[in-house]
């Protein structure tokens, strides 16, 4: 009798493992238009579903989330994502991160640089080597915060702020504790 129970248990375990999938699988995003707007995506996972079928809405696995706070970043259609299945159940997918193919890593990408880059070209770069935070707009605007200087650029205009002065367009306008000067000292207010 015990042999029958062991055989039955082994059969049940084999069936469970045949119908459940554990671990991470490469996927490609097919849809990000989540009707519930909670960060879900759909993806093709060829290793599990073949090349044509997509997952049901996959829940995100996020570093933090709560009522009206958290990190909300979605991949785009055709981006590579890692897909897992809750309890191994294919009907309950989770997207747990993204991956780049060779040549897809955005620049700059260094060991001490933390970059958030959108496909439209917007960037937030935290650069520990340069000791600065840089926000860049694809239209040319740039905002740089350094330890001793803050710079705002747009086209030919540049505003620099330091602990001792505010400088607009390389001295066209300067404001210091002593006063202000306009057009390279042609007009002064103060001492």
Stretch-by-stretch model annotation:
Residues 2-164:
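Hydrophobic packing positions characteristic
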Residues 169-191:
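Long terminal segments
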